[in-house]
């Protein structure tokens, strides 16, 4: 039909069908008030499909028929979250919730109660939807909060996600965050059908939702009964934020975004407690799994004032439901070795279903916990999913203990490398002293060394690391920089192109910064913030390596334990040799310069939008090297917000709080100062 003009009557019918189908989706998913049976909906949809097939020039990306049809992907592309997708802090009892309320009122200097919004804590997968001029242009998973995966094609297949927002009162750019769920009924049906076909079944609806969203073939996702609910705005451009969070949810409904119906605005913490008790009693009647309630400050102005701490907002909290418990038997107690050498006892259990999840392993945390609880092999124990998530052994039922129950001792030798295991007096954790020559520690150390916040070696994932160690291609972290193309291509599923890409990423990682290098070394207690602090203080690696414990303790934010760990690390011969070898192999960084009367020193900066001359990480590192602090969220403690192209909601929050806004040119001038 190419080149043939579409009759006006047909064009009008196509537009009418699209409008009707979108309206019925809105009534079904947003209002929960369907007005036609499924059979009639299917007839409308099939009529539209036939017309679009006959007149393909009428097809638009936002047509309801275009949810499925993309080619299978080879890989999910990474997506950087301009505003981090942070998780929430948790409380598990009334005392914890009251403490949260008290902290907020003290911070705001308020004696009287104020408004909270309470909503069920959905047990699904966090998802970010980006709409430009009302059209869905990107969907991304949370990932680590800073970088997620592009799952746009899969998300388009979820019928409750509008491809085009309703009405015309939407902003130029808006990021809608929410949760993807698989309802219980759909989950049960999916598993029944999978079982009949002999296919893999899922342990619980959350795993099913996650697995469905991460299918490389969107046609598979399209067959899964997924639903999306919105609960938050991230980026916003071309429209001012409303006053309250509940107004945001009203926007969502108006735009055709489903919002969970069991949301309530309450006055003060007593109302939150009442809401919690109500949901504890009614949770099983809900169509999908929830694992607690979420409490948010209703006022967006107050949210901006409260800001964030570490990886969570101060203005919201998750109040988790009581843990669910079951009995099972301990078949064995084995030992796992972590990156820092910590030897952790793990209980191997007779599989038992707890809150819909099959639990066969549970951590015993450390040997002090193991002996305090007196858990033995052969014991009948109570297993709990704390917060419906982490399997934990609560303790043994002594009345059921068999005579041959076996008490486990701390191993004298590492189960992986057979080096000595020591447990210093007063410490709960036993450690393998094998260091980076222990295969288990080596594996975890290499994964850490290559991670995004460390040397950022793209493509060096868990399975590849394990394979390199297994094939003895890497014997310590310096082995990364001695890999040969011929050795890589000889491995299963590693072709020429894959090997070239990996070697390019490894070569690129040689140029780094001192804070990243220090973090990559995996020193106990040294996260990326402490690494930046050390780099700012010493400027040179040699000076840090020679520093005494007393010198280290004089640095702000470095406590006695961290000082001892840092000192011990650099005074171990093996570690010093590895560092020298890495430098000899080409790992390098610009020297950290001492800060002299910088206008940036002591100031806190937040970036929003894209800068032309610098990447976000380059800008943050320049701020840190100049003695300033770069954070990811705006609060009343922020001194400057640097505004690049297409700024997000941080810009609006900064304006609301009266924080200094500077453009890229002004920021570069500050750097030169």
From Swiss-Prot:
Q: Which SUPFAM superfamilies match?
A: BRCT domain (SSF52113), DNA ligase/mRNA capping enzyme, catalytic domain (SSF56091), Nucleic acid-binding proteins (SSF50249), RuvA domain 2-like (SSF47781)
The GO biological-process annotations, alphabetized, read as: DNA repair; DNA replication
Q: Which residues form the BRCT domain?
A: 595-673
Q: Which Pfam families match?
A: BRCT, DNA_ligase_aden, DNA_ligase_OB, DNA_ligase_ZBD, HHH_2, HHH_5, Nlig-Ia
Catalytic residues, per the record, are: 121 (n6-amp-lysine intermediate)
Residues annotated as binding NAD(+): 38-42, 87-88, 119, 142, 179, 296, 320
Cofactors needed by this protein, per the record, are: Mg(2+); Mn(2+)
Q: Which PANTHER family match?
A: CHROMOSOME TRANSMISSION FIDELITY FACTOR 18, DNA LIGASE
Say what the protein does. DNA ligase that catalyzes the formation of phosphodiester linkages between 5'-phosphoryl and 3'-hydroxyl groups in double-stranded DNA using NAD as a coenzyme and as the energy source for the reaction. It is essential for DNA replication and repair of damaged DNA.
What is this protein's record name? DNA ligase
Annotated organism of origin: Coxiella burnetii (strain RSA 493 / Nine Mile phase I)
Species classification: Bacteria, Pseudomonadati, Pseudomonadota, Gammaproteobacteria, Legionellales
Q: What is the primary gene name for this protein? A: ligA
């Amino acid at each position: 039909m190419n080149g043939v003009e579409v009759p006006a009557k047909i064009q009008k019918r196509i537009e009418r069908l699209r409008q009707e189908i979108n309206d019925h989706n809105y009534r079904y998913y947003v209002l929960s008030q369907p007005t036609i049976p499924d059979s009639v909906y299917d007839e409308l949809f099939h009529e539209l499909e036939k017309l679009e097939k006959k007149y393909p020039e009428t097809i638009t990306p936002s047509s309801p028929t275009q949810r499925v049809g993309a080619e299978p992907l080879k890989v999910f592309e990474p997506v950087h979250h301009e505003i981090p997708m942070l998780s929430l802090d948790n409380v598990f009892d009334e005392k914890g919730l009251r403490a949260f309320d008290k902290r907020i009122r003290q911070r705001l200097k308020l004696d009287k109660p104020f408004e909270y919004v309470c909503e069920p804590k959905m047990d699904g997968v966090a998802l970010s939807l980006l709409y430009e001029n009302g059209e869905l242009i990107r969907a991304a998973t949370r990932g680590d909060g800073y970088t997620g995966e592009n799952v746009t094609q899969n998300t388009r297949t979820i019928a409750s996600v509008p491809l085009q927002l309703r009405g015309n009162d939407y902003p130029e750019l808006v990021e809608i965050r929410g949760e993807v769920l698989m309802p219980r009924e759909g989950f049960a049906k999916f598993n029944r059908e999978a079982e009949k076909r002999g296919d893999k079944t899922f342990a619980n609806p959350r795993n099913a939702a996650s697995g469905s969203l991460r299918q490389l073939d969107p046609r598979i996702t399209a067959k899964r009964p997924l639903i999306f609910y919105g609960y938050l705005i991230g980026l916003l451009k071309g429209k001012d934020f409303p006053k309250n969070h509940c107004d945001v949810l009203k926007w969502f409904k108006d735009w055709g975004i489903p919002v969970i119906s069991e949301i309530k605005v309450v006055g003060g913490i007593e109302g939150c407690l009442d809401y919690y008790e109500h949901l504890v009693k009614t949770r099983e009647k809900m169509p999908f799994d929830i694992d607690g309630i979420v409490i948010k400050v209703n006022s967006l102005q107050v949210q901006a004032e409260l800001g964030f701490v570490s990886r969570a907002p101060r203005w919201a909290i998750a109040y988790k439901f009581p843990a669910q418990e079951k009995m099972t038997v301990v078949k064995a107690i084995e030992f796992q070795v972590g990156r820092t050498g910590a030897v952790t006892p793990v209980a191997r259990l007779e599989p038992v279903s707890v809150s819909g999840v099959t639990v066969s392993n549970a951590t015993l945390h450390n040997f002090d916990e193991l002996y305090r609880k007196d858990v033995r092999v052969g014991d009948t124990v109570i297993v709990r999913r704390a917060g419906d998530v982490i399997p934990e052994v609560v303790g043994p039922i002594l009345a059921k203990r068999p005579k041959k129950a076996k008490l486990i001792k701390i191993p004298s030798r590492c189960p992986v490398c057979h080096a000595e295991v020591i447990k210093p007096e007063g410490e709960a954790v036993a450690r393998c002293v094998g260091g980076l020559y222990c295969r288990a520690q080596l594996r975890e150390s290499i994964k850490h060394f290559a991670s995004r916040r460390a040397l950022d070696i793209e493509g060096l994932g868990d399975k590849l690391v394990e394979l390199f160690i297994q094939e003895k291609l890497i014997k310590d972290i310096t082995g990364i920089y001695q890999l040969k193309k011929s050795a890589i291509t000889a491995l299963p599923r590693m072709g020429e192109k894959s090997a070239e890409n990996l070697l390019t990423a490894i070569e690129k990682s040689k140029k780094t910064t001192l804070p990243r290098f220090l973090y990559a070394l995996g020193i106990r207690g040294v996260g990326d913030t402490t690494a930046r602090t050390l780099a700012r203080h010493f400027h040179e690696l040699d000076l840090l390596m020679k520093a005494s414990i007393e010198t280290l303790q004089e640095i702000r934010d470095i406590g006695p334990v961290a000082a001892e760990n840092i000192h011990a690390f650099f005074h171990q011969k093996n570690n010093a040799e590895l560092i020298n070898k890495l430098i000899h192999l080409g790992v390098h960084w610009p020297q950290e310069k001492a800060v002299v009367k910088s206008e940036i020193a002591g100031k806190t900066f937040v970036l929003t939008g894209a800068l032309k001359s610098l990447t976000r990480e380059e800008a943050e590192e320049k701020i840190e090297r100049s003695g300033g602090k770069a954070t990811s969220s705006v609060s009343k403690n922020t001194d400057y917000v640097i505004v690049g192209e297409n700024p997000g909601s941080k810009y609006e929050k900064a304006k609301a709080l009266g924080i200094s806004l500077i453009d890229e040119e002004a920021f570069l001038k500050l750097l030169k100062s």
